[in-house]
Amino acid sequence: MAQVINTNSLSLITQNNINKNQSALSSSIERLSSGLRINSAKDDAAGQAIANRFTSNIKGLTQAARNANDGISVAQTTEGALSEINNNLQRVRELTVQATTGTNSESDLSSIQDEIKSRLDEIDRVSGQTQFNGVNVLAKNGSMKIQVGANDNQTITIDLKQIDAKTLGLDGFSVKNNDTVTTSAPVTAFGATTTNNIKLTGITLSTEAATDTGGTNPASIEGVYTDNGNDYYAKITGGDNDGKYYAVTVANDGTVTMATGATANATVTDANTTKATTITSGGTPVQIDNTAGSATANLGAVSLVKLQDSKGNDTDTYALKDTNGNLYAADVNETTGAVSVKTITYTDSSGAASSPTAVKLGGDDGKTEVVDIDGKTYDSADLNGGNLQTGLTAGGEALTAVANGKTTDPLKALDDAIASVDKFRSSLGAVQNRLDSAVTNLNNTTTNLSEAQSRIQDADYATEVSNMSKAQIIQQAGNSVLAKANQVPQQVLSLLQG
């Protein structure tokens, strides 16, 4: 080896080794201080990618476990409300058993029915107000998906149902008969009295009525109309004033005579969907029904409505609306425009049949047993929505209370309702157990993944402490050797001194 001064190769080699050892010492100190074997991708690129995927799974599964616990809380909240609904149903059943014995008076039954109604109202309140984090859990049918995994479509569904008196089949539930039928004064709701209605049959037309007082050609009267039972109008056909309406007088024997000085001061308008003729004088609609023997009506509107029974069968009928807003079932002749009130008969709790009675729409559910409507038999307890209620009798009397509102087979109805609640509670119990199992599995999976991640990225302190100690010793030795290497060029001076 040449003796040189400018380049100390031994010192350079020693410095390089010291730098390498310094890097190893720094890595060991970093791992020991962070606890991680992989502090950056340069430590282990593949290991860093694997560990990062584990981190995503672990965090996702941890949140999924929290989601599942929330799902358990939803099911518990819902079941708690159902438990209270069940308590109310059991009380209603107890009261119903009490009501079915024959020793109860009408007053007793009324008291029992009041508590039953209160219990059913409470069921409706619980159904409408039970919430979890702002979500109504018993107010409507639906489902709630609980995310129980770290990836897409890893869910458990909680089925929710609307549970109230209506869905339980207890809407209008009653343990007593409405067996008192009262009547009001003669009906004026149709804008016409029920006596002395003008009918086309049996009317004798006088000679004077055959000719318009202001015309010269022969004319005849097509019909006579009234809006209040006192003032009458006649429609003229033929002659100079064909199609016009004039005031007339009607004698007790049915003779119709043109009123003195009568003028055609009435206009004709169309009455909605019925194609019937309405006389309007001064903005007041008058009688439009020119059918012999039919009740007359001061109509606000006639429209087609649909009734649906519990089996989903539809029945179409016309709804006749009077000036008070009451709706009555009606028949409409599309050709003549004639509107007549549809009548029914019904049987009260004593078994007595009523006289023909007009059908009023919009009554309370389960209040009327309808024997016959256009040849079809219905029990209004089976009706859904617009139930039937008697309103106007053929004799002109309005029924304000209707018979036979007692629920058929009430205990069976309650047993069915309780069974429905039990079935829902069973499904909630099953989903609670499933979610609880999911939480256990998620926790186990999270533990195993965390251990796997630890083996990849965590520092082994025994190894790293050993590596650090080794690097420190080498560092100290390197520093000592470097001092010796730096003194080698001085040996060349001895050659110069000689």
From Swiss-Prot:
This is Flagellin. PANTHER family: FLAGELLIN (PTHR42792:SF2). Belongs to the bacterial flagellin family. Keywords: Bacterial flagellum, Secreted. It is found in: Secreted; Bacterial flagellum. GO terms for cellular component: bacterial-type flagellum; extracellular region. Flagellin is the subunit protein which polymerizes to form the filaments of bacterial flagella. Its main location: secreted. The keyword Secreted applies. The gene is fliC. It comes from the Bacteria. Pfam families: Flagellin_C, Flagellin_D3, Flagellin_N, FLIC_barrel. InterPro entries: Flagellin, Flagellin_C, Flagellin_C_sub2, Flagellin_D3, Flagellin_N, FLIC_barrel. GO terms for molecular function: structural molecule activity.
